[in-house]
Regions:
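C-terminal extensions of enzymes
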Residues: 1-15, 23-32, 39-40, 143-149, ...
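Non-catalytic, usually N-terminal nucleic-acid engagement modules in DNA/RNA processing proteins
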Residues: 1-183, 296-299
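Conserved, mostly hydrophobic/aromatic
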Residues: 21, 54, 89, 131, ...
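Hydrophobic alpha-helical packing residues
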Residues: 21, 162-169, 209, 238, ...
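Generic secondary-structure signature for well-ordered alpha-helical cores
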Residues: 136, 167, 171-174, 240-243, ...
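Glycine- and acidic
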Residues: 148-152, 156, 216-222, 331-334
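Glycine-rich phosphate/ribose-binding loops and adjacent secondary-structure elements
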Residues: 163, 172, 176, 180, ...
Length: 376
C-alpha cells in the first residue's frame, strides 16, 4: 500500500509496499517486456544499477513461453530470478497496437497473434487469469487503448466499456487471489484512466474508477501522438480526482524532462522502453544532455559516457571504446549502453527523491528539466 511521506507542491515523496518489498517513490520501472531487459541485462544487473521495480508484458508472456509455463515454473519472480516487485501490464496496449484484424466486443477483444497469426481472445477475466499465473505484485486492468486523436463519441463509448471491464477485472482479481493455489494471493489490481485528450471525459472516468477503491491508479493512453503540453494538461486535469492515498502511475512515459514535469504534477510511478531502446542505437543520456555515440567526434574520446556518472560502465569504459563496439556491431555495445541509460534513469529518480526529501525539488526542476532535454 502507499504511504505519503512528504510533498512539495503537487510533487509527492512516498513509499509503496507489496509482497516483494517496499518501493521508494517516485520510481521508474525498468521494462523487461518478455521477462528480460532488451540489451542482455540480467536480474542481477538490475539490482546493481538500482532498479526497484521490473515491468513485464502480459501479452508477450502469454504468447511465449505462455503464462501456464511461467506458473508451472513457480511464477515470474522465480522464473527470472528477480526477488523485487514486478508490475505486469494488462496486454491491452499490445492487443491494440501490434495485433491485426482485432474485433472489439463487450466480452473482450478477438485478435490475431502478431507472431503466427493464430486467433486469440482476451477479455478482463482472461487478462486477470494470465497475470495471476505470472504472479506479479501489481496487475493492470484490461482496457482499450484509444488512438490520439479519436472522435469524441467513440472515446465516450470506449471509456464506458473500459469502466465495465474494470468492474469485471476487480471481481476476477479478488476471486483468483482467494484460490488456495494462486501464485501470489496478495496481487494488487490498479485501474487505468482513459479518455484521449478530452479533459472532461478523463475527469468523469477518473471519478468513476476512483469510487472502486483500488490500491493504485494509472493514466493511460498518453505519449501516443499528442504534444508534451497536451499530456501535461491532461495530467493536471485528472490529478485532483486521483485518490491522494493511492499510487499514481503515468504509463509509457517518458523522457527525463517528461518525468520531472510529471512528478511536479503528482505522479509516482513511470515506465518507458525509450532509455533501453535509445541505448541500443547509441543514444545515451548524460547530466548535460543526450549524446549520439556513433558521432565521429567520439572516435578518440577517452572520457566516460558521462564524467558525472558512477555507473559500472562509466567507471571503466571510454566513449571511444563503446563507439568502436557499436561500429563493429558487437553485442557488448548494446549491453553497456543499456546498462548506462537505465542506471541514469534510476539515478534520476533517486535525485528526485532526495530533492523532495530536502525540500529542494523545485530547484532541481529548474536546473535539470530543460537541460536534460537537449542534445550535445
Amino acid at each position: 500500500m502507499f504511504k505519503l511521506l512528504k510533498a512539495e507542491g503537487n510533487a509527492r515523496r512516498g513509499e509503496f509496499t507489496c509482497a516483494h518489498g517496499t518501493v521508494q517513490t517516485p520510481v521508474f520501472m525498468n521494462v523487461g517486456t518478455q521477462g528480460a531487459i532488451k540489451g542482455a541485462l540480467s536480474a542481477e544487473d538490475l539490482k546493481n544499477i538500482g532498479c526497484q521495480v521490473e515491468l513485464s508484458n502480459t501479452y508477450h508472456l502469454h504468447l511465449r513461453p505462455t503464462d501456464k509455463v511461467v506458473r508451472e515454473m513457480g511464477g515470474l519472480h522465480k522464473f527470472m530470478t528477480w526477488d523485487g516487485p514486478i508490475l505486469t501490464d494488462s496486454g491491452g496496449f499490445q492487443v491494440f497496437s501490434l495485433s491485426s484484424l482485432r474485433k472489439i466486443k463487450e466480452e473482450g477483444v478477438y485478435f490475431a497473434s502478431h507472431i503466427d497469426g493464430r486467433k486469440i481472445f482476451m477479455g478482463p477475466e482472461e487478462s486477470m487469469q494470465i497475470q495471476s499465473n505470472l504472479g506479479s505484485d501489481i496487475c493492470m486492468a484490461f482496457d482499450e487503448c484509444i488512438e490520439n486523436p479519436s472522435p469524441r463519441d467513440y472515446v465516450r463509448k470506449s471509456v464506458d466499456r473500459t469502466y465495465r471491464w474494470l468492474v469485471r477485472c476487480k471481481a476476477e482479481n479478488a476471486r483468483l487471489n482467494s484460490l488456495p493455489d494462486t501464485v501470489n494471493p496478495q496481487q494488487m489490481l490498479w485501474g487505468i484512466n482513459q479518455g484521449s485528450t478530452y479533459a472532461d471525459i478523463r475527469i468523469d472516468h477518473m471519478k468513476r474508477i476512483a469510487d472502486l477503491d483500488l490500491p493504485g491508479y494509472a493514466i493511460g493512453g498518453l505519449a501516443v501522438g499528442e504534444t508534451a503540453e497536451e499530456m501535461y494538461d491532461i495530467i493536471e486535469a485528472v490529478e485532483p480526482y486521483m485518490p491522494a492515498d493511492k499510487t499514481r502511475y503515468l504509463m509509457g512515459v517518458g523522457t527525463p524532462t517528461n518525468i520531472i514535469e510529471a512528478v511536479a504534477r503528482g505522479v509516482d510511478f513511470f515506465d518507458c522502453v525509450m532509455p533501453a531502446r535509445n541505448a541500443r542505437h547509441a543514444r545515451l543520456f548524460t547530466w548535460e544532455g543526450a549524446i549520439n555515440l556513433k558521432n565521429a567526434k567520439y572516435q578518440l574520446d577517452e572520457s566516460p559516457i558521462d564524467p558525472k556518472c558512477d555507473c559500472p560502465v562509466c567507471r571503466r569504459y571510454s566513449r571511444a571504446y563503446i563507439r568502436h563496439l557499436f561500429v563493429a556491431e558487437e553485442m557488448l555495445a548494446m549491453r553497456l549502453a543499456v546498462m548506462h541509460n537505465l542506471y541514469f534513469y534510476n539515478k534520476l529518480m533517486e535525485k528526485i527523491r532526495n530533492a523532495l526529501d530536502s525540500g529542494e525539488f523545485e530547484a532541481f526542476r529548474r536546473e535539470y528539466s530543460e537541460k536534460l532535454n537537449r542534445r550535445i
